[in-house]
């Protein structure tokens, strides 16, 4: 009941905060881009042009690196929007290299992360405190460090299309794979808060598919009681939480809190899962 009253009283504030969050999602945080947005009275044309200049600089920087892995870096960089728009969102090495050797791409991911172009997210095959001990580097997600840049990168071949749909997305009149953008910006915010990114998938042999898919796992709790916290990211107001519920049953003794990050207001479910609006991710 307390949560219900809080939700009712803060509805106008939540609506305003979500609008500002969507602005940030589309514009990003690059100083020149933000300046263009403010100076042009919150129009998007020059915003997109500034972002494309930054993306061009990234590509030029890649062309200057050691040729031994320059092509690998480019192949990952160019396909980031495609990987993130897929269901699993992870990099599929076999689509880049028929030998399917993930280890051959380790320097590639390191360069992209070290250059602050991307944020890495590794699979944990047995999530517990000390996530790096169960890290599986054969499975990786590669997020853009700036979600505004990801939006423009996704429309590299159709810049005029991108310019025409900014306002439509901002006003919720058009949906362009918001799941990709939401998950990317949550990754961006978690990294900014100091978290190293991990995810978890469980493959069901009988069903021949994943039956648990957790977007992010972070370390949480105080110094005397450190545990893990699973996070599911939802870009729409209607969703299911089967994966998170199964994960909680499987690893309940290891879990501090479980979170759903969604477009709706703050609430706590009867099963203890904490649902937070996307703009509150920095609190985790």
Mark where each language-model region is:
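A cross-kingdom feature that marks ATP-driven nucleic-acid transaction machinery
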Residues: 107, 113-284
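Interdomain hinge/linker elements that couple catalytic modules in large macromolecular machines
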Residues: 1-182, 196, 202
């Amino acid at each position: 009941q307390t949560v219900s009253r809080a939700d009712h009283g803060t509805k106008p504030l939540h609506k305003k905060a979500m609008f500002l969050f969507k602005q940030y999602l589309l514009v990003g945080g690059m100083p020149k881009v933000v300046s263009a947005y403010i100076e042009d009275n919150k129009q998007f044309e020059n915003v997109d042009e500034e972002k494309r200049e930054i993306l061009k600089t990234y590509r030029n920087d890649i062309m200057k690196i050691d040729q031994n892995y320059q092509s690998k870096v480019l192949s990952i960089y160019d396909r980031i929007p495609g990987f993130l728009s897929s269901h699993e969102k992870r990099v599929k090495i076999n689509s880049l290299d028929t030998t399917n050797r993930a280890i051959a791409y380790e320097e590639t991911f390191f360069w992209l992360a070290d250059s602050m172009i991307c944020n890495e997210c590794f699979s944990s095959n047995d999530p517990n405190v000390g996530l790096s001990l169960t890290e599986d580097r054969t499975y990786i997600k590669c997020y853009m460090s700036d979600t505004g840049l990801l939006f423009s990168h996704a429309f590299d071949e159709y810049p005029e299309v991108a310019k025409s749909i900014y306002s439509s997305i901002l006003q919720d009149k058009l949906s362009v794979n918001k799941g990709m953008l939401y998950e990317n910006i949550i990754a961006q915010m978690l990294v900014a808060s100091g978290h190293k990114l991990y995810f978890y998938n469980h493959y069901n042999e009988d069903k021949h598919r994943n039956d648990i898919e957790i977007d992010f796992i972070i370390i949480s709790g105080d110094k005397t009681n450190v545990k893990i916290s699973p996070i599911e990211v939802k870009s729409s107001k209607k969703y299911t939480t089967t994966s998170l519920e199964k994960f909680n049953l499987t690893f309940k003794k290891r879990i501090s809190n479980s979170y759903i990050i969604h477009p709706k207001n703050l609430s706590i479910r009867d099963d203890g899962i904490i649902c937070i609006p996307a703009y509150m991710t920095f609190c985790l």
